[in-house]
């Protein structure tokens, strides 16, 4: 991971594909007839873990796009390929937001049933913009290179609270600790 400096190698075991399968199925809600688009480059962990392994292990068709960013082009791809599940980054959502709601509303995006974000905090305005632009909130989730798979998520069944990254997946315990690593009570 190179988030805070020069890239460092991250080792993941082969069994990690089981986590990608499970989170693809239960967090991303991947179904056999879906057309899935993860906009992350395969040079990043999201591009491999959730651009390739999660959809492949769930038997889902993936859209692969190698071109540059253009709001009109991205919405045209969703329309043309009838994308049903879309996984993108908050930076991309903010760039799409600059285009306003008029551009996405020129396209038939009715195939989309689920939209998610990952890679950095999603500002509440991004969630609201998704609702205004195409009738779906972005479901934020959290993980990092070192965890190898989604750890905290807004599940498909959850009502999204703008600004919330969701709840831990089964088997993950989370909490807030102080400077001595002691748990801090809610409030």
Which residues does each predicted region cover?
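Short catalytic-loop micro-motif centered on adjacent basic/acidic residues
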Residues: 9-10, 37-38, 62-65, 87, ...
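Conserved AMP-binding A3 loop
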Residues: 1-18
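Conserved ATP/PPi-binding loop(s) of AMP-dependent carboxylate-activating enzymes
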Residues: 168-171, 182-187
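Ligand-binding pocket scaffold of soluble enzyme catalytic domains
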Residues: 11, 18-22, 26-28, 32, ...
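Residue-level recognition of short loop/turn positions
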Residues: 4, 178-181
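Active-site beta-alpha turn of Rossmann-fold NAD(P)-dependent dehydrogenases/reductases
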Residues: 1, 40, 148
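Gly/Ser/Thr-rich phosphate-binding loop
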Residues: 57, 83-88, 97-160, 173, ...
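Conserved AMP-binding/adenylation subdomain of ANL enzymes
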Residues: 15-35, 42-85, 98-99
């Amino acid at each position: 991971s190179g988030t805070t400096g020069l890239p460092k190698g991250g080792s993941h075991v082969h069994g990690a594909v089981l986590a990608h399968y499970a989170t693809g199925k239960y967090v991303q809600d991947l179904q056999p007839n879906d057309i899935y688009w993860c906009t992350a480059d395969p040079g990043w962990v999201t591009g491999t873990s959730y651009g390739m392994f999660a959809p492949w292990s769930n038997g889902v068709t993936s859209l692969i796009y190698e071109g540059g960013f253009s709001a009109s082009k991205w919405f045209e791809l969703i329309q043309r390929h009838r994308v049903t599940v879309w996984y993108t980054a908050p930076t991309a959502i903010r760039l799409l937001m600059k285009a306003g709601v008029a551009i996405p509303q020129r396209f038939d995006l009715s195939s989309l049933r689920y939209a998610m974000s990952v890679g950095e905090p999603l500002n509440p305005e991004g969630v609201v913009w998704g609702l205004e632009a195409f009738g779906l909130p972005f479901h934020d989730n959290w993980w990092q290179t070192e965890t190898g798979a989604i750890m905290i998520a807004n599940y498909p069944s959850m009502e999204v609270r703008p600004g919330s990254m969701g709840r831990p997946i089964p088997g993950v315990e989370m909490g807030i600790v102080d400077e001595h690593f002691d748990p801090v009570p809610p409030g």
